[in-house]
């Protein structure tokens, strides 16, 4: 069948059209693939460096909650400096999340502040009460990488602090194998403490690094070389500033399980008010007072701490380990014969975590046997249940 000229041209051009269509399809497919990979990479990055929900809300400057402690940085932004000081104080109080959020606001105030990113990286790391988690490890590493990228804007001391974390934060972090990184970090901080012998914060950070190498619990022998070294570093700070909140906090822990817990008493007298609204700092002197049998002082410290925990609901305190504060309050009051304080603390504890064992034991301590028998909220857990049942049978 004879085709028209136009038809012949159309027929002749079909391979060209198909080729062009195929090229367009391939181009669209390539772009779609790139976009898909980019989306996947972004999603993967978001999964690797995810942050707690609290980070969606900026943390304010805390004003009356904070103390006078100051850690000068090279930023020209007064706001960045204020948030940096807040971050340091929160970390010295073991309020890790509030610390990281404060350093974030310092970064917002001065995006070129390398040491502000160091602060965030430091706050995500291991500390006395726990190893860095696998969730926090990528957060720490991401903040460190930002600090390193901005390191030219830092002064020499800040740059040294930033680089000190390179030995501490690695890819593929394994909490079970962190001793290698912790030792390397402690060695680096030892060098910095020698380079900057008059910097009390660097010395405190060195002591913090040494503590990571120690068992958290258990008896400490005063003749142990590691204990001698740790005590020596902290005592060198406190000899120059007995009000240093970070050094005294660590020193209380470093001495409480030795034969001489009273060594921390001079600085403990100042520690409770060093960061007025941080409940853990309010509470910390009681570790020393309990070991010394100074029950009234321990009750007072933990009462203030519990008040700070409650004030956190209206933004006038920072709640840190509230159940621990109440447990120590119940115990110190029971030992000191303060029945009202002990029983009320045990009631508050039961409301907070559902554990009625302390309430039952406080009633036994003060001979309130009818009230013991009236209890009907048996707690969970073998130890707590055994205490509760003991009180019922007593």
Residue ranges and their predicted role:
Residues 136-147, 179-190, 223-236, 261-273, ...:
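Alpha-helical repeat scaffolds
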Residues 78-85, 113-124, 154-173, 198-218, ...:
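Amphipathic alpha-helical repeat scaffolds of TPR domains
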Residues 108-109, 195, 238-240, 270-277, ...:
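Solenoid-like repeat scaffolds
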Residues 79-102, 173, 391:
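Alpha-helical segment of the N-proximal tetratricopeptide repeat
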Residues 47-76:
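N-terminal pre-domain segments of enzymes
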Residues 28-39:
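Bacterial N-terminal signal peptides
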Residues 90, 124, 167, 210, ...:
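Residue at a conserved register position within TPR or TPR-like alpha-solenoid repeats
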């Amino acid at each position: 069948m004879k085709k028209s000229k136009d038809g012949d041209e159309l027929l002749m051009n079909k391979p060209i059209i198909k080729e062009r269509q195929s090229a367009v399809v391939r181009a669209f497919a390539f772009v779609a693939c790139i976009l898909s990979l980019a989306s996947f990479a972004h999603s993967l990055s978001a999964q690797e460096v995810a942050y707690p929900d609290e980070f969606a809300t900026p943390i304010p400057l805390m004003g009356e909650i904070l103390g006078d402690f100051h850690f000068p940085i090279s930023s020209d932004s007064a706001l960045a400096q204020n948030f940096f000081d807040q971050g340091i104080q929160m970390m010295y109080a073991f309020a890790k999340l509030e610390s990281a959020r404060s350093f974030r606001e310092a970064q917002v105030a001065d995006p070129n502040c390398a040491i502000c990113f160091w602060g965030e990286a430091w706050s995500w790391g291991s500390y006395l009460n726990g190893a860095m988690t696998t969730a926090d490890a990528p957060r720490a590493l991401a903040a460190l990488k930002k600090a390193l990228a901005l390191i030219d804007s830092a002064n020499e001391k800040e740059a040294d602090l930033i680089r000190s974390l390179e030995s501490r934060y690695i890819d593929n972090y394994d909490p079970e194998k962190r001793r290698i990184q912790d030792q390397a970090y402690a060695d680096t901080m030892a060098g910095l403490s020698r380079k900057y012998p008059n910097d009390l914060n660097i010395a405190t950070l060195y002591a913090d690094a040494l503590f990571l190498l120690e068992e958290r619990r258990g008896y400490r022998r005063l003749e142990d070389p590691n204990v001698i070294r740790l005590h020596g570093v902290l005592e060198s700070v406190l000899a120059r500033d007995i009000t240093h909140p970070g050094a005294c906090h660590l020193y209380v822990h470093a001495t409480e399980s030795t034969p001489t817990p009273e060594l921390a008493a001079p600085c403990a007298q100042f520690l409770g008010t060093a960061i007025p609204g941080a409940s853990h700092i309010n509470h910390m002197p009681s570790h020393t007072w309990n070991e010394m049998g100074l029950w009234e002082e321990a009750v007072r410290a933990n009462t203030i701490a519990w008040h700070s925990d409650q004030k956190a609901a209206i933004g006038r305190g920072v709640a840190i380990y509230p159940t621990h504060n109440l447990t120590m309050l119940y115990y110190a009051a029971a030992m000191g014969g303060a029945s009202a304080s002990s029983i009320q603390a045990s009631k508050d504890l039961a409301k907070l975590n559902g554990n009625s064992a302390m309430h039952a034991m406080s009633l036994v301590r003060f001979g309130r046997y009818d009230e013991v028998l009236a209890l009907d909220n048996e707690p969970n857990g073998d130890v707590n249940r055994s205490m509760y049942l003991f009180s019922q049978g007593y």
